[in-house]
């Protein structure tokens, strides 16, 4: 492999990609956030995806100067692809990154997109921007490929190197080059998709499939709750069959699973098909925070406790366990609902950045040692600390109080006799 690599976007996805390539090659790491560049130069990653030691031992030239990208002939773009308030794809970060690259791209460069998009977006949306700002012709002067990111934030087992990499290119020759570049660092190997659209579609259905399956579990949990059946016990029993899929109910947030299905449904509607199952799954999952909050109220009443002024400790704010990422977390909706009912809510998160919680949600996160006795403790996110010290947090629930368990980590025998357990 004889390519000069650059990675555009050094967040949860781009940084692990850059660091992994930097272990074997010299890499240019570009981000428009100058404070992020400064932190990385000081071997600090606020996402906790890459350790200080790994940052020290990788060969990356960090920069916020786009001119430095001229030194690269293999540019990987890994920027966020969110949705807007109407649940429509927001391609602005991707198009701005394409504009940045287009202004500095040199002939014979290959641009590979890793950002999750709907099928066709790379060639229909990104390529015209690259051509406009470069004055070059795609397929003649420069080329594109697509290799969807599969990073799982907080997961130290399934990493960039150990997950099979789907790769694609606009020609067979480009495909081979893209495969060769990624094969140099991805030990799990690569899968050569037959086209860029196939690779785009493969990525977007990975998370759509998961979203729909979790929605099914959430609907079952709602049904079983009305039937007074323990969902966890049902899943244990069903799980004894070899082909039963191991999905569990819960909140669906973050920048992938709760977002990507809308990219696919957008494209489906654009070509004249109204997707029913996918959108039904989205509705179920988006309503779970309201469902959980309403059950807090019901359980307080069952216990004979006053709703107005009832006290709650919410444990966990991030969108998933053992990860500081607050993007698109659904826990905030539970908190907002409880406050609307007049409850006094205290929020603790052992992983989240306090400044970001304040910036994004106006929340003041409380240190663990400052948590007080309350009517309700709600285990929202199963961070390692909460798992290992469950009893300490349960002991903060008053007699006749309630423990709410969103992820099925608490057993009834862990509670005091007068306390009540509600599990999703």
From Swiss-Prot:
Protein name: Protein CapL
GO MF annotation list: NAD binding; oxidoreductase activity, acting on the CH-CH group of donors, NAD or NADP as acceptor; oxidoreductase activity, acting on the CH-OH group of donors, NAD or NADP as acceptor
NCBIfam families, per the entry: NDP-sugDHase
Database matches in Pfam families: UDPG_MGDP_dh, UDPG_MGDP_dh_C, UDPG_MGDP_dh_N
Role of this protein: Required for the biosynthesis of type 1 capsular polysaccharide.
Tagged with keyword Plastid: no
GO biological process: capsule polysaccharide biosynthetic process
Keywords tagged on the record: Capsule biogenesis/degradation, Exopolysaccharide synthesis, NAD, Oxidoreductase
Similarity comment: family membership: Belongs to the UDP-glucose/GDP-mannose dehydrogenase family.
The protein's annotated pathway: Capsule biogenesis; capsule polysaccharide biosynthesis
Species, as recorded: Staphylococcus aureus
Keyword Oxidoreductase: yes
């Amino acid at each position: 492999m004889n390519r000069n690599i650059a990675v555009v976007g050094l967040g949860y996805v781009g940084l692990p990609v850059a660091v992994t390539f930097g272990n074997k090659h010299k890499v240019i790491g570009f981000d428009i956030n100058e404070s992020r560049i400064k932190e990385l130069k000081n071997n600090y990653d606020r996402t906790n995806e890459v350790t200080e030691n790994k940052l020290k031992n990788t060969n990356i030239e960090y920069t916020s100067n786009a001119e430095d990208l001229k030194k690269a002939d293999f540019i990987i773009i890994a920027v966020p692809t969110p949705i807007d308030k109407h649940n429509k794809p927001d391609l602005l970060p991707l198009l701005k990154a394409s504009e940045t690259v287009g202004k500095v791209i040199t002939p014979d460069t290959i641009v590979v997109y890793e950002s999750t998009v709907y099928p066709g977006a790379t060639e229909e949306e990104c390529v015209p921007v690259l051509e406009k700002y470069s004055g070059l012709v795609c397929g003649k002067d420069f080329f594109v490929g697509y290799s969807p990111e599969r990073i799982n934030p907080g997961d130290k087992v399934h990493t960039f190197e150990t997950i099979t990499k789907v790769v694609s290119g606009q020609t067979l020759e480009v495909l081979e080059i893209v495969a060769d570049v990624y094969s140099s660092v991805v030990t799990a190997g690569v899968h050569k998709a037959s086209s860029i659209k196939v690779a785009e579609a493969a990525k977007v259905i990975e998370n759509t499939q998961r979203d729909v399956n979790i929605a099914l579990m959430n609907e079952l949990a709602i049904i079983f709750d009305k039937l007074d059946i323990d969902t966890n016990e049902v899943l244990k029993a069903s799980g004894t069959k070899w082909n039963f899929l191991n999905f569990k109910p819960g909140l669906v947030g973050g920048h992938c699973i709760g977002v990507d299905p809308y990219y696919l449904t957008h494209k489906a509607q654009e070509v004249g098909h109204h997707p029913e199952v996918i959108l039904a799954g989205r509705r179920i999952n988006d309503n779970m925070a309201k469902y959980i909050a309403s059950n807090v109220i019901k359980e307080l009443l069952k216990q004979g406790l006053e709703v107005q002024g009832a006290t709650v400790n919410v444990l966990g704010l991030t969108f998933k366990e053992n990860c500081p990422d607050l993007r698109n977390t659904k826990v905030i909706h539970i908190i907002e609902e409880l406050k609307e009912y007049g409850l006094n809510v205290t929020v603790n998160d052992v992983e989240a950045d306090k400044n970001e919680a304040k910036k994004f949600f106006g929340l003041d996160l409380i240190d663990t040692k400052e948590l007080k006795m309350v009517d309700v403790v709600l285990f929202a996110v199963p961070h390692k600390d909460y798992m290992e010290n469950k009893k300490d947090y349960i002991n903060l629930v008053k007699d006749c109080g309630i423990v709410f368990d969103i992820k099925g980590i608490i057993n009834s025998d862990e509670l005091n006799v007068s306390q009540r357990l509600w599990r999703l």
